[in-house]
């Protein structure tokens, strides 16, 4: 990837009106997703085409609001939702993240390269840009990695200008991560969905990170399952797709599954956001468009072409 294009990508600043997007989303969930992707891609590429390389904007995370100095820490947020039901907790998660209450290090994206070899022998290559950790609420010094259901995850991804990863992306992120956690499952049961389990698992991850000396803000993986997009959801709308929690390269604990409903979330789930803009064959393209291309999609997906609106199911 050329340095000029790389700098151009990292200096991107979206000018899309989220009020307009929100209005369209409410018209129809499925059609709203299609409209959202079309508007997001068009806005992204227009901004990238007109931005001077020397202009330093907030980058691909420019649609994420700044964190308020008065925002809750991760511990405070956990306390605030410890005795509410799951629906109330989801609304609280959405509210906190929409207000920009997430650690600063999540705004510094990491490049991850993926490839696909054509029958002709030519290798196609793409670089996606991902948040270095799973979504969390709080500050750099006190944050809670926060699982959430598919409805909440899709709303946040679209609001911030991101998409959820494919299964192939999850594998690539794990392979590229310099810091790979060893999975730490907790006993199964209804308590898996509790805020207390969220806290306990978060503390376990922090302890392992400190023990193994993982650098702050590094690209990490292996500590949670990913919520992903998949064509399976076109046949199982209303479900959530999860995959990952790797024990090593090519060895996920969780194979691709759509057994749970879209409203389900437990401590083992994580939301990894992927920028809606990627570099492929030296060009800036929208991930949505790449995944719809019958050839290019293979670089980012091991399922072939994926229509994201359908792949999100009934989110």
Model-derived features: positions:
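N-terminal secretory signal peptides
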Residues: 1-27, 38-42
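Twin-arginine (Tat) signal peptide motif
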Residues: 23-33, 47-54
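N-terminal module-boundary/linker segments of secreted carbohydrate-active enzymes
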Residues: 55-103
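Conserved oxyanion/phosphate-binding beta-strand-loop segments in alpha/beta enzyme cores
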Residues: 101-130
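Second-shell loop/turn segments in exported
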Residues: 137-144, 159-160, 259-260
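Conserved hydrophobic ligand-interaction patch in extracellular adhesion modules
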Residues: 150-213, 273
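Acidic, glycine-rich loop-and-strand cores that form catalytic or ligand-binding grooves
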Residues: 192-245
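Low-complexity, Gly/Ser/Thr/Pro-rich intrinsically disordered linker/tail segments
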Residues: 266-315
């Amino acid at each position: 990837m050329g340095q000029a294009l790389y700098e151009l990508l990292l200096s991107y600043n979206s000018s899309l009106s989220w009020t307009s997007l929100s209005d369209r989303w409410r018209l129809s969930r499925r059609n709203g997703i299609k409209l959202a992707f079309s508007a997001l891609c068009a806005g992204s590429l227009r901004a990238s085409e007109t931005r001077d390389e020397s202009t330093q904007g907030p980058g691909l995370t420019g649609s994420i609001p700044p964190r308020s100095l008065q925002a809750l820490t991760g511990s405070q947020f956990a306390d605030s939702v410890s005795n509410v039901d799951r629906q109330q907790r989801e609304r609280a998660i959405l509210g906190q993240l929409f207000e920009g209450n997430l650690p600063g290090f999540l705004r510094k994206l990491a490049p991850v390269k993926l490839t696909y070899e054509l029958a002709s022998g030519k290798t196609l290559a793409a670089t996606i840009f991902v948040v270095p950790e799973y979504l969390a609420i709080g500050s750099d010094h006190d944050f809670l990695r926060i699982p959430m259901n598919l409805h909440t995850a899709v709303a946040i991804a679209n609001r911030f200008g991101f998409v959820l990863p494919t299964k192939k992306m999850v594998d690539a992120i794990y392979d590229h991560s310099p810091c790979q956690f060893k999975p730490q499952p907790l006993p199964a049961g209804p308590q898996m969905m509790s805020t207390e389990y969220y806290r306990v698992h978060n503390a376990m991850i922090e302890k392992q990170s400190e023990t193994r000396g993982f650098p702050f803000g590094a690209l990490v993986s292996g500590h949670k399952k990913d919520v992903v997009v998949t064509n399976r959801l076109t046949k199982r709308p209303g479900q959530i797709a999860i995959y990952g929690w790797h024990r090593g390269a090519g060895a996920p604990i969780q194979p691709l599954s759509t057994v749970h409903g879209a409203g389900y979330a437990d401590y083992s789930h994580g939301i990894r956001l992927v920028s809606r803009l990627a570099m492929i064959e030296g060009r800036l393209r929208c991930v949505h468009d790449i995944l719809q291309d019958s050839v290019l999609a293979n670089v980012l997906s091991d399922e072939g072409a994926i229509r994201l609106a359908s792949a999100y199911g009934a989110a």
